[in-house]
Amino acid sequence: VSSLNAASRNTSDALALIGTIDGALEESQEILLRMRELAVQSASDSNTGTDRTFIQDEINQLTAELNRISSATEFNSVKLLDGTYNDKAIQIGTGPNQTFKLGINATDAATLGAYEMQSVTEANAADATLVMGAVGTHASAKSALNDLFNVAADYVVKGSFGTKTANVEAGADAKDVAKAFNLISGTTGVQANAVTRAKISAITGADTYSFTLQGKSTTASTVNATIASTSNLTELKDAINSVSGATGITAALTEDLAGINLVQNEGYDIIIGDVTAATTHTAVSFDTSSPPASSAGATLTSGAAHGLSVGDIVKYTSTAAVTGLTTAKFYEVASVASTTTLTLKTTDGEDVTYGGGGGNANDTLQKVNTINVKTVSKNNTTGLLDDGSVTTLGTATTDDSMAIVGQVSLSSHKAFTVSPGNAANHFNASTNTVTASLKQVGDVDVSSQLGATNALSVIDGAIAMTSEVRSDIGAANNRLEATADNLSNISVNIQRSLSSVEDANFAS
């Protein structure tokens, strides 16, 4: 009986320990919910930079308290939430190995968060400057998801719940890619989100501008705005927002008022076309960096380096070969005159200048002396991709249109991997399996609109992590309560039996 009573006391202690853990986690969740509230507040462009700084100050204080709870929560001088309370045994019976195992991961700001990955974006690409009044073909979309315009893709997602394949059809935009991942999220535990960002900047003169803008609607909307000063684009922002009901594209001024950030929150392509101005020489830049951040997208520049070096071996292909070069032949880079011009050495030792005015927008140069093949295509007339896979040496064009593809973000509160089912993996520069990385809630920065938006999924992951722990210890609590009741019942009945035996012995 005394052993049963000891086991019962152990069980009661374990219930008190679990109650301590749950109470601490409840406070941690309240902190995370407040952080999420602040992130939502900061994500609105009704806030100034100063407002967001003050909001970030509170985020920092909440993060510090989250860490304090993790390090200070203890029971009987034993730390519970710092990651050291693992695989602990609670003796809940009178015999050997009649134990209950309990373990809790750390719940500090460096451990809580979300596992995430994003589709690959370009650091630089071509056709940033669109000359007003010029007529040209539409510029290509600037994203690693470009390939999906022509090629279907399969992604094998291995998540916490199971493994399943996301099937993306040819012609998909970021919205379609995210939908394919969300269709299997019940099996994988991985959620997808698509968003398209662009930026309007570098307007060189006050003028009356007109262009078409297309997002979620199949029909483009016309935007007309007269800009009185290039240092304040309020008129253009208002004109874009006046058609946001049709496009789903919202515009917000940058801090200096001289630029506009465009966002399509559903992941539809942002298509800008037919750009004109009353003064035909006036130029405006459209790029996909909105605002600078690791997941913001590409910055389109019209003078990026070609990325080739002396000694590189390239295969030249063209429908209209430059004089001195033969299509489908191999050449060595003899010299690099500038970031946009180089000299190719022919098999007979002759040097042919290529690039700048000597290039052709239909040319392709394929670098063949490294694992990462570099390819020049007519879709990029000047520019360098961030993964070093594509360079262009042709002359810059005056295209007046472009399509900007969105970015897809995958997120889960558990680790996961994505593997390409075919030759392309748009979540990596290669075809290898990609492992999601943990975005820590301690690194949340809401001092910008984009940072606040990105913080939401990280905080949601942290909330899911703590919810899962509370669910597990809730189940453990229910089990231990049943154990305690059973031990009490056994103890009472054994005591009753012993009393009967003692009474019988006394009577005899």
Question: Language-model features: where?
Answer:
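Basic helix-extension-helix modules of the SAP/HeH family
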Residues: T317, G355, N360-N362
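Histidine-centered active-site/metal-ligand motif
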Residues: H306, D363-Q366
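Autoprocessing Asn-cyclization modules and mimics
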Residues: A283-K329, A334-K345
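Primary detection of the long, small/polar-rich alpha-helical "axial" segments characteristic
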Residues: V1-S290, A296-T299, G311, D348-G349, ...
